[in-house]
Amino acid sequence: MANSNNQLLKEIRYDWNREEILQILNMPLIDLMWEAQIVHRKFNKYDIQLASLFSVKTGGCEENCSYCSQSIYSASEIKSHPQFQVEEVLARAKVAKNEGADRFCMGWAWREIRDGKSFNAMLEMVSGVRDLGMEACVTAGMLTEEQASRLADAGLTAYNHNLDTSPEHYKNIITTRTYQDRLDTIKRVRNAGINVCCGGIIGLGETNGDRASLLEVLSNMNPHPESVPINSLVAIEGTGLEDTQEIDSIEMIRMIATARILMPESKIRLSAGREKLTKEAQILCFQCGANSIFYGDELLTTSNPSFQSDRKLLKEVGVSFNKDFETCEKTLSSL
């Protein structure tokens, strides 16, 4: 590896190039995990953020993302529903908090946020979640500067807008929104003073070079995204990628470890596809840099490990909950 341990720990960089990243990504696995854990221990406390994700409005999205069952171009049989009422969403947030989550993420299957009644309700939901003492995150497509400002005023903690894949592979996945559209949205979020949640998906038919290119874009953002979700494709029947072969868990571990080295202080979130990972694979992801998970039975339209199974897993690796499951603390000194 071109960088020694001292170089890795010396400073946070925003000038990684694709060749450097590819070299890290392709390191012998044991060496890669070792390097990632050194960085992780240097820059982060040993805790795992528990985030709960709820689909506020499902289905009918105008985008043609080939992995998504919520697209109007998808033949998937999903249960679409209009936007939930504010009270219903806040009730879900209370349940998530009582189960141990400290961030409540709300998703809308929209191409973009549009002003009006639905947006006003979104603002109420954000304020209500913050009043519960939780972080609030929204994912709802593109937005304007004014909308970002209003979300910031409502107390929004973070806005999620993933890049999905590399600039080079992107056109093979979606054509109704450009890569630059995504980058512009992220810039508006950042300019409004809202934390950025931005990551991608592996298993979309991309190469290792594409993965390095995606990480190059993310790691050259200054500052780095506060949260970086790393998803693996959940192939859903009726979508354009329904026949895509499932990736090996080692590929997820490599992606998590490399992201940690490149973005030492970001929350690296082990996201969609986690249900397919064994307990041991998840623990390796935690060991080499993942310090956030989605916590709850469902992620928008895909399944997720249950509260009960996650509690058991986190307890086994050293996470203890208080009696009301309202807070959690992770002690992984043994890893």
UniProtKB/Swiss-Prot annotation:
Keywords: 2Fe-2S, 4Fe-4S, Biotin biosynthesis, Iron, Iron-sulfur, Metal-binding, S-adenosyl-L-methionine, Transferase. Its EC number is 2.8.1.6. [2Fe-2S] cluster binds at C105, C137, C197, R269. One of its GO terms (biological process) is biotin biosynthetic process. Pfam families: BATS (PF06968), Radical_SAM (PF04055). InterPro entries: Aldolase_TIM, BATS_dom, Biotin_synth/BioAB, Biotin_synthase, Elp3/MiaA/NifB-like_rSAM, rSAM. SMART domains: BATS, Elp3. It comes from the Bacteria. HAMAP family: BioB. Catalyzes the conversion of dethiobiotin (DTB) to biotin by the insertion of a sulfur atom into dethiobiotin via a radical-based mechanism. This is Biotin synthase. It comes from Prochlorococcus marinus (strain MIT 9301).
